[in-house]
């Protein structure tokens, strides 16, 4: 098929009923990009022979090298369907535009799936039939369920059942049935959870005496069933695929049955009676051993083709098969020794996978007209947003009205090298424009000279013996132009195109000055002016042009060098050798976007109740249609389409909402990214002078990757947070080669830890036996404050961790200082009443928690760290006030104690890491009498303190730390959940690698119908670097781990433990030969942070050196 003209795409964009926005999602290596290649080949974008090999949408070199997708790529496909009309020989032609997004499958890049899913209306879910449902398969199915995307299922790599597992057609049919059951069971679990939440919500409404009717949801249409034509059986690498409807049409004439009837019986327990030639079910078998129709009519024919081509080549049988299927084979095809190519030729003509997928997409997945009505409640963040938005905008979004107000959602910002953008036609400037440019160039030259203090001297200087009266020329030039103040000229001018970010790979020459003017048509055609050459835009007939001709030794050279050094940063910002442009990846929900249109940009924190905050204005400079790596320029783009937008750089960081100016908008940026940036490194330039380029590069990387988090530590270090080892490697490569363009050095990956304590049997005696364990009395000025600490149970800690977003929403806490690990976790929002009810239920599950946290609603004074963490601050007798009840604090310095609590849980006593699972109770605040003060013997006590409130903050922190250490302290390390699928041959090697890295096996089971074992293990993140490569080496590539961050886990060892009993001393000695893992990690963290470490520098001084005796 020849390539489709861009005008065809533009025409189809105007009809949302013929548009399908879909994304391809799956586990890593399940065949997404190979399937995309086949779909691209159907549009003539690539050759059919290269489909599955070229990986067209993997445009990055490292994607091609590793063979995995790292970034989402979009492309538009054209598909035409011919349907028969009753009473007419002319077929009914319907054209469709399919906007396809190929997303990554690796867990490190799952944020790309989240960004793609919000833009789409449907999803193509691929499952490798040999590996079955894997960890990422469940993740992408959950993403589809959350975003209300309608999915279709593609059972890919069926050829592996023939060539690798060597199953019979009947065994393959049973295996395929089980895979479909696995997928449906996952979807069923989502439905059951949602139904349970609906039931809980209904009961809460009844308790409020609201007449709420319970609506029972039907689950009949949510499952995959081949008879419903929402399942495709395929082998993308071999280029074939089909759904039941296609083969029902194929066998319609051969069997003399109606297509609708055949479609109902081609899948399932239906058989053909060989005597009566009738289709029967299980009841009609009567003990006979018959094969299902799917096996006898479909799978056996496919198996026969593979056996006669791949297993043992039989040319006569191949010709017979081609004739039966009405397939045209050339003589060169039959003579070819490439069996795979012959197989692709036959199967591609009989059952092309592109036709099967695109036909199913058109028939089963909704258009924007249909989906936006159903998904609008999911897209909108809350009901209050809906009530506050303009009714015209709401109606336009529901109907996908291209004439209504504009609304669009930007899911992420793409960074594209400027040279890869489409070249725009440049208009030839008129003579008047050339003269104006020449005048401006002279004006800039005079300003630069004036700044150098050389204007007066130049009138007296003869630059060239052969030139004419240069001093007169300079005087005339000075008189004919307006020279603004030098201070205004040295300020960097903002670019008209907000989307151009410059990256300097080498320092600019001191003479290569360049200026930009408002009168230019495009930023590419900037006028360059250098004092050592004639600018190209100066009219050669201008009598003043000779003043720009200089000899090789320029008398102004030294002065201009001084100017360049003074304004080096400004120069770097204005001119560079490499440029990156930010293009927004967006979906238009209503209205029509036009180039040059002024639009309102709403940030993710925008609230319709405060319409003046988190809102900016931008101008759309360019619109693009995505065609893989290529971009097609557009002038307008109506609703229902996926489009690229330039002009939003600096306005949209990672995601945002575009609303027509003057219209009350709504926040569409409520997408929940299921990722956690857990791996952190400190980056710095190899050359300290290039720090500004690193900062600029980090900002651009932060915008271009939705999973990256960058910030500056208190120490001044620039920190880069990524999702995993592979993601970190890609980010550092992009930062070096694209965004910063400089050589970068980075620290060893730093993993976040947590600190906690527990009650253990071998704890040391309490510090104060009279007060009890975990109690500390703070004596400060005239106050005696008693603090009590105790550990929270695991269920309470998990609840607080899962509902941090709800707590933050209720307390309206700013997220600017939140830990990125905290920000990315959390479930859906709960209101205040629901949160307290759910929290009380969790507390009542355990007797100890119920005893310690009784009456928490009145006592609760705060959470921490960042006021939303997994630690609780309580107070007796309203000393600190009540957080939820709103009662005032009885103690005048309550804020100081609250701030001290936040400091204490933000940096624990072990290694200055955040504390988790601690409850602090302020039992009493006693104002001491003079006699009590005089009886105090503590030498650290101070009675007269000038700034008591400030001193109380640090003293509270120290007191809580003292009470913390009275228990058995523990270091918590970050844990990966590791899923590995491997064969029995290398099972022992996988176990060895995991155990060697302090991991533990959680479960192991053999996947039914396959020779593979499914292993689930927990591996510490700090020990997981190089794990994937190590396992691949040990197993010769037979096993590939998938690592997902799953929280923090205690190292079950006291970091301060030393041998004390006779048995321990006898076994381990005074120096404890057994390594204390907890102490090792605690010391490593303290060493990295520059904290004191209690360790012996020299153990045995006499053994350091052996002197020879003469």
UniProtKB/Swiss-Prot annotation:
Q: Name one GO cellular component term.
A: cytoplasm
Which controlled-vocabulary keywords does the entry list? Cytoplasm, GTP-binding, Hydrolase, Nucleotide-binding, Phosphoprotein, Ribosome biogenesis
Any one GO MF term held by the record is: GTP binding
Signal sequence segment: none
Give the source's domain of life in one word.
Answer: Eukaryota
Q: Which GO terms describe its biological process?
A: cytosolic ribosome assembly
The catalysed reaction is: GTP + H2O = GDP + phosphate + H(+)
| PROSITE patterns reported for this sequence | G_TR_2
- Localization terms from the record: Cytoplasm
Its family remark reads: Belongs to the TRAFAC class translation factor GTPase superfamily. Classic translation factor GTPase family.
Q: Quote the PANTHER family the UniProt record gives.
A: ELONGATION FACTOR-LIKE GTPASE 1, TRANSLATION ELONGATION FACTOR-RELATED
Record's protein name: Ribosome assembly protein 1
Protein encoded by which gene: RIA1
């Amino acid at each position: 098929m020849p390539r489709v003209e861009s005008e065809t795409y533009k025409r189809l964009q105007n009809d949302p009923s013929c548009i399908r926005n879909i994304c391809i999602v799956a586990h890593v290596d399940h065949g997404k990009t190979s399937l995309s290649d086949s779909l691209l080949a159907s549009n003539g974008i690539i050759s059919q022979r290269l489909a599955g090999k070229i990986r067209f949408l993997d445009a990055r070199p490292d994607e091609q090298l590793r063979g995995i997708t790292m970034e989402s790529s979009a492309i538009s496909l054209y598909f035409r369907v011919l349907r028969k009309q009753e009473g007419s020989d002319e077929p009914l032609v319907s054209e469709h535009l399919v906007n396809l997004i190929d997303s990554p499958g690796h867990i490190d890049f799952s944020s790309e799936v989240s960004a793609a899913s919000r833009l789409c209306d449907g999803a193509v879910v691929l499952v490798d039939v040999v590996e079955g449902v894997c960890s990422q398969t469940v993740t992408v199915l959950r993403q589809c369920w959350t975003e209300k995307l309608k999915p279709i299922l593609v059972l890919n790599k069926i050829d592996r059942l023939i060539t690798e597992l060597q199953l019979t057609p009947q065994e393959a049919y049973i295996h395929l049935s089980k895979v479909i059951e696995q997928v449906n069971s996952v979807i069923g679990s989502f439905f059951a959870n949602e139904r349970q939440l609906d039931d809980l919500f209904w009961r809460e409404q009844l308790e409020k005496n609201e007449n709420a009717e319970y609506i029972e949801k039907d689950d009949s249409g949510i499952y995959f069933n081949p008879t419903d034509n929402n399942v495709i059986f395929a082998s993308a690498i071999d280029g074939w695929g089909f759904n039941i409807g296609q083969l029902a049409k194929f066998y319609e004439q051969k069997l003399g049955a109606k297509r609708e009837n055949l479609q109902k019986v081609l899948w399932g327990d239906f058989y053909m009676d060989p005597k009566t030639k009738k289709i029967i079910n299980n009841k009609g078998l009567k003990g006979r051993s018959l094969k299902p129709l799917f096996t006898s009519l479909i799978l056996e024919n496919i198996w026969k083709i593979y056996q006669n081509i791949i297993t043992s080549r039989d040319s006569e049988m191949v010709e017979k098969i081609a004739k039966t299927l009405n397939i045209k084979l050339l003589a060169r095809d039959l003579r070819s020794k490439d069996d795979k190519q012959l197989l692709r030729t036959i199967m591609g003509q009989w059952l092309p996978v592109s036709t099967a997928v695109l036909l199913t997409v058109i028939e089963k997945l909704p258009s924007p007209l249909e989906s936006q009505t159903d998904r609008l409640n999911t897209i909108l963040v809350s009901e209050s947003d809906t009530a506050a938005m303009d009714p015209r905008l709401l109606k336009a979004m529901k109907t996908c009205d291209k004439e209504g107000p504009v609304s669009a959602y930007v899911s992420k910002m793409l960074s594209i090298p400027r040279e890869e953008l489409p070249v725009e036609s440049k208009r030839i400037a008129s003579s008047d424009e050339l003269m104006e440019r020449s005048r401006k160039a002279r004006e800039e030259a005079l300003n630069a000279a004036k700044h150098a203090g050389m204007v007066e001297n130049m009138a007296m200087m003869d630059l060239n013996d052969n030139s004419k009266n240069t001093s007169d020329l300079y005087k005339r030039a000075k008189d004919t132009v307006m020279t603004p103040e030098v201070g205004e000229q040295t300020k960097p001018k903002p670019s008209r195109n907000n989307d151009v970010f410059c990256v300097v790979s080498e320092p600019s020459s001191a003479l290569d000055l360049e200026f930009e003017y408002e009168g230019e048509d495009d930023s590419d055609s900037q006028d360059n002016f250098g004092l050592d050459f004639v600018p190209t835009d100066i009219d050669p007939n201008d009598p003043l042009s000779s003043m720009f001709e200089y000899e090789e030794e320029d008398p102004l050279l030294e002065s201009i060098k001084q100017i360049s050094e003074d304004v080096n940063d400004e120069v770097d910002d204005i001119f560079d050798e490499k440029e990156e442009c930010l293009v927004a990846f967006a979906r238009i929900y209503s209205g029509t976007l036009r180039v040059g249109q002024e639009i309102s940009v709403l940030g993710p924190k925008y609230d319709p109740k405060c319409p003046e905050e988190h809102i900016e204005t931008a101008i759309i400079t360019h619109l693009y249609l995505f065609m893989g790596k290529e971009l097609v320029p557009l002038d307008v783009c109506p609703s229902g389409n996926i489009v690229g937008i330039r002009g939003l750089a600096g306005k949209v960081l990672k995601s945002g909402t575009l609303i027509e100016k003057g219209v009350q908008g709504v926040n569409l940026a409520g997408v929940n990214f299921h990722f956690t940036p857990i791996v952190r490194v400190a980056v710095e330039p190899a050359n300290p002078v290039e720090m500004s380029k690193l900062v600029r590069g980090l900002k651009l990387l932060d915008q271009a990757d939705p999973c990256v988090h960058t910030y500056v530590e208190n120490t001044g270090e620039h920190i880069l947070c990524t999702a995993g080892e592979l993601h970190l490697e890609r980010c550092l490569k992009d930062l070096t080669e694209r965004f910063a363009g400089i050589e970068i050095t980075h620290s060893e990956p730093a993993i976040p830890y947590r600190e906690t304590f527990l009650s253990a049997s071998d704890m040391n005696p309490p510090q104060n036996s009279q007060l009890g364990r975990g109690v500390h009395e703070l004596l400060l000025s005239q106050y005696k404050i008693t603090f009590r600490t105790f550990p929270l149970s695991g269920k309470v800690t998990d609840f607080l961790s899962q509902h941090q977003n709800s707590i933050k929403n209720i307390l309206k806490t700013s997220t600017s200082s939140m830990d990125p690990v905290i920000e990315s976790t959390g479930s859906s929002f709960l209101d205040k009443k629901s949160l307290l009810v759910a929290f009380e239920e969790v507390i009542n599950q355990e007797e100890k928690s119920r005893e310690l946290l009784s009456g928490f609603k009145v006592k609760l004074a705060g959470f921490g760290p960042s006021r939303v963490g997994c630690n609780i601050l309580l107070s007796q007798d309203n000393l600190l006030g009540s957080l939820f009840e709103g009662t005032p604090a009885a103690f005048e310095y309550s804020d100081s104690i609250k701030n001290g609590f936040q400091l204490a849980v933000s940096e624990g006593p072990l290694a200055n890491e955040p504390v988790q699972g601690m409850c602090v109770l302020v039992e009493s605040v006693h104002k001491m009498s003079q006699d009590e003060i005089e009886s105090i013997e503590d030498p650290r006590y101070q009675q007269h303190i000038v700034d008591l409130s400030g001193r109380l903050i640090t003293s509270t922190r120290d007191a809580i730390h003292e009470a913390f250490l009275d228990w058995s302290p523990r270091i918590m390390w970050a844990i990966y959940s590791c899923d590995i699928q491997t064969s029995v041959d290398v099972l022992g090697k996988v176990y060895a690698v995991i155990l060697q890295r302090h991991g533990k096996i959680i479960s192991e089971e053999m996947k039914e119908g396959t020779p593979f074992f499914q292993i689930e293990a927990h591996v510490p993140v700090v020990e997981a670097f190089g794990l994937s490569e190590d396992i691949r080496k040990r197993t010769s590539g037979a096993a590939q781990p998938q690592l997902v961050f799953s929280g923090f886990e205690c190292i079950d060892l006291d970091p301060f433990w030393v041998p004390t009993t006779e048995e321990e001393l006898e076994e381990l000695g005074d120096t404890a030969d057994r390594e204390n893992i907890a102490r090792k990690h605690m010391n490593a963290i303290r060493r990295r942070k520059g904290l004191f470490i209690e360790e012996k520098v020299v153990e045995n001084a006499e053994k350091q050196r052996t002197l020879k005796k003469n």
